[in-house]
Every structure is written in structure tokens, then in C-alpha cells.
A protein has these predicted regions:
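NTP/phosphate- and nucleic-acid-binding module
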Residues: 1-145, 149-151, 155-721
Length: 721
């Protein structure tokens, strides 16, 4: 008898998908884009008829010939070498960003950037963000908001109404992006008026808000790839086929304008690369970064934790406090060396202070404020206003300058709860914050000393860094002559380091130029920690002055500077940089002593007493576990040195040394061998074990001496002959 199936009830007619609901809007948007694109094309075709020759100056001074509104950066690159064109993603035309396929409009200078350049990566990932935006529209009918490139990759924020995206849906988004890339969709550019842009994006309230905030007379550029059209100043890749590999990493929640009272958004993160090898390397780095996550290591090593009773404020446990205090102690050593004076200032100030400093007008939403006896007070988010009060407390003489005030005061900033992230984004923190009050003629020397101090500190941690000089912006305040002198002083300080640095024109603060310092950890990730900023405005706001040599009142200049930045943030960076394997001088677990048996337990505690007297963190594992188990546990807990002591070591007053990486350094005298080496390792803040260095150095010296003796003997024999 044939199998029969139960009758299936007819399915309810499915409603239109979110994309189908938006399809008429998307179609209208494309129709308008094509209309304006045709208008652009007509202009270009008319301009081409002049056939006017142009000269293009390359970075090496070479001059290339071209035709106005015909020749593009791509054509110039192809004329030099095909590989140059294939590797060039972005052009700078007279310093301005330019699409590789966009025709040049006159005589100009030209510089090309590839994926290896930060500028090239930024463009590559920004173009990829448009592909992600297209995928989100096609898959979910999303209302797109903003989609920038970030440090490593990009994201797009979109509005899905009540819908959210789960981690399992990233695969579908990724497949859609891969399909778009294979379609080789060209990136097309148009320029429209404000009213035309409003018409084009009329059904996306987020884009309408962005457009409405622009001036009435603004010219707005838009880009299209496939059916997706977006507001964008560009430039972009020639087409989507330049994107070879895609990985959609995660979805998270966000809010429009980063305001929790506004519409909830879905943020989708992704990354792309021009070849599979780079993607494989990226995934390896991500896996390694997960293992090094400071939040994970913080729990494993019992360094710190967070609690819902005080979000964004860290509880440092005893082991974590040891590291934290060592960092502070290190900076205090440098302050002494560079003749800073440490001060202690209040945590709470009347809001009159913040009105004077300008924080009340520009920073209040990031401050914790409260009423005290009908007056408004605020927890300090930074130290500079308090230091200004300290400087202005009495009349100052030119002889007192430079005045270097250092402060480890506790700071509070009211970060959004959604932005809090381990130790890297907190509400309560401390900084190695200092302010230098100086004369104009002292600026250069003070800046040079700061950069030298910065280099010495980062070298101790094994951190590399890069520096950028950010010069005056368009809306700068103060005298041009003062700015010129300040920028020259910063430039001279940078040149004095002998290191390469970059110019970042127009990116200084309105109140003074600065050096932006980016640090790189062991995984080559970038972090902003240190800062040095000249300030001409705060002394004016607080009416600060000193009596000059001519017995006249003069305005000081303030240098804001920090090296660690937030101690909490640096703690997180170093945790991940060292992968929890703290160098001996910074380690909260320096020495574990393991007695072989009950007979050597007393000697183990004697060794501990000797080491503790010198300030070393050490413990004795006198549990009844087997010795091998004790050693293994100590290694897993990242004790730098494990000292095994038995009857022989007790008799000889020695210790048997091994490291957490199970490198055995053998038997050493307690005082002459162990203690002397540990003291030296701590003093020089070595990143490596000195026992191995000593042993190899001694062996090398012994070998060299033997070779020298053999050579001398040989020479003596020859002379006798």
C-alpha cells in the first residue's frame, strides 16, 4: 500500500517583506540619482571638449601630462606601472581626497595611497561599509544612519524598528556582501543641492536630519553602489570587486546620536581585506586578542572585577592593586627625575569653577553633579582647573617658572552605560596628569623634556609609538604669532627625538596645538594614551599671570601632559600586551617558594622572609601536594620564579630556580646569587629574566676568553719558531 501524507493546510498569505515595503522608496531614490548622474555626465562631457592639457606633479617631482576632465589618477598610475594602479586605492589631489577614477580638473599635485597606508585602509573600509549598508537594505529593508571605518574594519548603524539582529544572522549578511562584491558594482558619485538631497532621502528620517543640519547653500556629494545610495563625501573604490574577502563579526545595540533617549539602532561590525592571507592573519590576531582580553586575565589572576552596584568603577583586588601601585610608583620616580612637584587637589568643586573653565557649557553632560546647601557642585572630570586655582592662589614670579604640577587625583566622567568596557572605558579613574606653567621662551625645552620622558617610559614597557603634530584649526583663538611660536617649539621637540613624525594640519584644539601620540602593543593594535597639549586660553579664563623680569604682569602658557593617560586604561593595555605574563618588576606574583618536603618547610619560610625584607612579592606553597603539582600550579598562576628548596639547598643555603615557562636555571646562592639578581632585575625594570642572560653572557665571556688564550698561545708558538 502506498504511503500517504496527511493533508497540509494552505499557508496564510505572507505579508510583504521589509525590503518589499521599502522597494518603492529605493526605486525613487535610484531614479533621482540617475537623473543627477546624467546631469553630472553632461557637464563632464562638455568640459572634455576643451581638450586642455594639464601638468600633474608627483611626490618625487616628476611631471606627468594629462587632459583636463579626461585624465584620472588611475590613468596616471597606469602610465607609470600597471601594478601601481592595481595597488592604489586613493589619490590626494593638491592634498584633497580624490577618487582614483575621477577626472582631474586642472594642474595639480598627485599622491597615491595603497592598503598598506592608513589613508588607503580607511577608504577601503569606508567603501566596504557601503556594501554592508546595501546588504542591510536588501536583507532587512533597514533605514541606514551612519557607517564609518574604524581602527580595524567598519560598522553600519541601522534602524529596524522593533526588530533586532542575532549573532546567527551575521552569516546571511556576510553572504549578501560577498554576492555584492562579486557583482563588481561601480561606485558612482554625484553632487546635489540640499533640497535635492532631501527629496532623494525623504523616507529616511535619519538622513533627513543629517541633511537638514547642513547650510541651505551646501553642495552635497552622494555615492551609489548597486541599488544603495548614500550621503558621503567619499572618495571610494572604483567598484565592489576590489573587496576580496569579508567577515561580519558581530551585532550590537546603539542609539541614534549616541543618546539613549533617541531611537534604538542595530550596529553591525565587519572587516574586509584585499586578499585571503590578510584575512587569515586578522583572524589569528582576533583569536590571540581574545586570549589576551584583560577582562578574562583580570578574573583568572584575581586582579580586579566590576560590580553592578558601581558601574564603570573598578574594584582592584590585592594582586591588581600591586600592579596599579607599581605603575604609580614608576611615574613618581620619573617625576622626581624630571623635577615635577606632586600636588593633591579636591575631588569636588562648586560649579563656579566649571563655569570659569568652560566645562559647564561644553562638558556638563559628562560630569556628575549634585546640590550641596542649594549650590551646585560637580566631581572633577580633569585636574587642570584645580591646578589653575593653585597657580593663581598667590602672586607668582618669573623665577618660579616653569612650575610642574603633577596630580594623581581621582577623576569621574559620566560615560553612557553602553559605552563602558572593562578598564578601557570607565567612570572612575586616575591619570598621570601634570600641568606645566611656563614662559614662552621655556616651551621648547619643556616639550623636549616631556618627549624624552615619554620615550623612556614606553621603552620600559616595550611599547612602540608614533607621533603627529596637530596644528591650528580654522577657528583658533589667540594671536597668530603665539601659535607660530608654539608650533615651532613642538616641531623642534619632535625633531630632537630623531624619530619620524607626521604632520596633521588643522587638527589642533582651538586653544592650542598638540602632539598626538599613538602607542602600539604586541599585537600591533593602536591606542591613544599619552598627550601633550599647549593651552593659551585657560590662563586667560582664570586670569593667571606672573611678574616678569621687567616687573610687568605676563600670561603663562599651560602645557597639559600625560604619558600613561588613564592608569586604568594603561593597566588594560599592558595586561593584553604582556598576555598576563608580567615582567618581574611589575608582577604581582614574583616568587613562589616550593619546599620539597616537611623537612625543608622552615627553610622555605626563611627564604620568604629574606625576600620580603627587600620588598618582593613572594609566598610559600607548603600544602601537602606533590612538588611537581605545586610547580605546575605556580607556573599557571604566572609566578615569575619558582624556587624549589630541599635538604641539599637548606644545607648549602641555596635555591633551585625555574621560571613560569619551565626554564630551569639551577642552583644559586640565596644572597649572592638569587637576591642580587632579583634586585638588579627590579632596579633596571628588565623585560626579560636576568638569570638566563647572566648564564649565557658568562658562557659567551668564557668562550671568548678561551679563544683569546688559544690565539695568544698560537701567536707565541709562531714567534718562538
Amino acid at each position: 500500500m502506498a504511503d500517504t501524507e496527511a493533508p497540509v493546510a494552505p499557508a496564510e498569505p505572507a505579508g510583504p517583506s521589509p525590503y518589499e515595503e521599502k522597494a518603492p522608496y529605493y526605486a525613487k531614490r535610484i531614479e533621482l540619482f540617475e537623473k543627477y548622474f546624467e546631469r553630472e555626465g553632461t557637464k563632464v562631457e562638455e568640459a572634455k571638449t576643451t581638450n586642455e592639457p594639464i601638468k600633474v606633479v608627483m611626490p618625487d617631482g616628476a611631471i606627468k601630462e594629462g587632459v583636463k576632465f579626461v585624465t584620472s589618477p588611475w590613468d596616471i598610475a597606469m602610465g607609470i606601472h600597471k601594478k601601481l594602479a592595481q595597488g592604489s586605492l586613493l589619490a590626494h589631489v593638491d592634498g584633497a581626497d580624490w577618487d582614483m577614477r575621477r577626472p582631474l580638473e586642472g594642474d595639480c599635485s598627485l599622491k597615491l595611497f595603497g592598503f598598506d597606508d592608513p589613508e588607503g585602509k580607511e577608504l577601503y573600509w569606508h567603501s566596504s561599509a557601503h556594501v554592508l549598508g546595501e546588504a542591510l537594505e536588501l536583507e532587512y529593508g533597514a533605514d541606514l544612519t551612519i557607517g564609518p571605518s574604524i581602527e580595524e574594519g567598519f560598522y553600519y548603524d541601522c534602524f529596524l524598528g522593533d526588530r533586532t539582529l542575532s549573532a546567527t544572522e551575521t552569516e546571511g549578511i556576510q553572504k549578501r556582501m560577498e554576492k555584492i562584491c562579486k557583482e563588481k558594482q561601480p561606485f558612482q558619485r554625484i553632487e546635489v543641492s540640499r533640497s535635492e538631497a532631501l527629496e532623494m532621502f525623504q523616507e529616511n528620517k535619519f538622513k533627513v536630519e543629517l541633511i537638514s543640519n547642513l547650510p541651505e547653500e551646501a553642495t552635497i556629494s552622494c555615492y551609489r553602489c548597486g541599488p544603495m545610495v548614500d550621503l558621503c563625501r567619499g572618495p571610494h573604490l572604483p567598484d565592489t570587486a576590489w573587496i576580496k574577502t569579508v567577515a561580519v563579526n558581530q551585532c550590537s545595540r546603539a542609539h541614534w546620536r549616541a543618546d539613549v533617549t533617541k531611537e534604538p539602532l542595530v550596529r553591525v561590525y565587519a572587516v574586509t581585506f584585499p586578499d585571503k592571507k590578510l584575512m587569515a592573519e586578522y583572524k589569528l590576531r582576533i583569536e590571540e586578542a581574545k586570549k589576551r582580553d584583560h577582562r578574562l586575565i583580570g578574573l583568572q589572576q584575581e586582579l580586579f572585577f566590576f560590580h553592578t552596584l558601581s558601574p564603570g568603577s573598578c574594584f582592584f583586588l590585592p594582586q591588581g592593586a600591586k600592579v596599579y601601585n607599581k605603575l604609580m610608583e614608576f611615574m613618581r620616580e620619573k617625576y622626581w627625575e624630571y623635577e615635577y612637584d606632586e600636588v593633591i587637589t579636591p575631588n569636588v568643586y562648586n560649579f563656579d569653577l566649571w563655569k570659569t573653565s568652560g566645562h559647564a557649557a561644553h562638558y556638563k553632560e559628562n560630569m556628575f553633579s549634585f546640590d550641596v546647601e542649594k549650590a551646585e557642585f560637580g566631581l572633577k572630570p580633569m585636574n587642570c582647573p584645580g591646578h589653575c586655582v593653585m597657580f593663581g592662589n598667590r602672586k607668582r614670579s618669573f623665577r618660579e617658572l616653569p612650575m610642574r604640577l603633577a596630580d594623581f587625583g581621582v577623576l569621574h566622567r559620566n560615560e553612557f552605560s553602553g559605552a563602558l568596557h572593562g578598564l578601557t572605558r570607565v567612570r572612575r579613574f586616575q591619570q598621570d596628569d601634570a600641568h606645566i606653567f611656563c614662559r614662552q621662551d621655556q616651551m621648547e625645552k619643556e616639550l623636549a623634556a616631556f618627549v624624552k620622558m615619554l620615550d623612556e617610559v614606553y621603552e620600559v614597557f616595550g611599547l612602540t609609538y608614533e607621533m603627529k603634530l596637530s596644528t591650528r584649526p580654522e577657528g583658533y583663538l589667540g594671536e597668530l604669532e603665539t601659535w607660530n611660536k608654539a608650533e615651532a617649539a613642538l616641531e623642534n621637540a619632535l625633531n630632537g627625538t630623531g624619530k619620524e613624525w607626521k604632520l596633521n594640519p588643522g587638527d589642533g584644539a582651538f586653544y592650542g596645538p598638540k602632539i598626538d601620540i599613538t602607542v602600539f602593543d604586541a599585537l600591533k593594535r593602536r591606542f591613544q594614551c599619552a598627550t601633550v597639549q599647549l593651552d593659551f586660553q585657560l590662563p586667560i579664563r582664570f586670569n593667571l599671570s606672573y611678574v616678569s623680569e621687567a616687573n610687568e604682569p605676563e600670561r603663562p602658557i599651560i602645557i597639559h601632559r600625560a604619558i600613561l593617560g588613564s592608569v586604568e586604561r594603561m593597566f588594560a593595555i599592558l595586561t593584553e600586551h604582556f598576555a598576563g605574563k608580567w615582567p618581574f618588576w611589575l608582577s604581582p606574583r614574583q616568587v613562589m617558594i616550593v619546599p620539597v618536603s616537611e623537612l625543608s618547610r622552615d627553610y622555605a619560610h626563611e627564604v620568604r622572609t629574606v625576600l620580603r625584607k627587600e620588598g618582593f612579592y613572594c609566598e610559600v606553597d607548603d600544602s601537602d601536594r606533590k612538588m611537581q603539582k605545586k610547580v605546575r600550579e605556580a607556573q599557571l598562576e604566572q609566578w615569575n620564579y619558582i624556587l624549589v628548596v630541599g635538604e641539599g639547598e637548606k644545607t648549602n643555603r641555596t635555591v633551585n630556580i625555574r621560571t613560569r615557562d619551565n626554564v630551569v636555571h639551577g642552583e644559586h646562592k640565596l644572597e649572592e646569587g638569587l637576591l642580587e639578581t632579583l634586585l638588579r632585575e627590579r632596579k633596571i625594570k628588565s623585560l626579560t629574566c636576568l638569570f638566563g642572560v647572566e648564564k649565557s653572557a658568562a658562557a659567551a665571556a668564557e668562550k671568548a676568553a678561551a679563544e683569546a688564550a688559544a690565539k695568544a698561545l698560537e701567536e707565541a708558538s709562531i714567534s718562538k719558531e
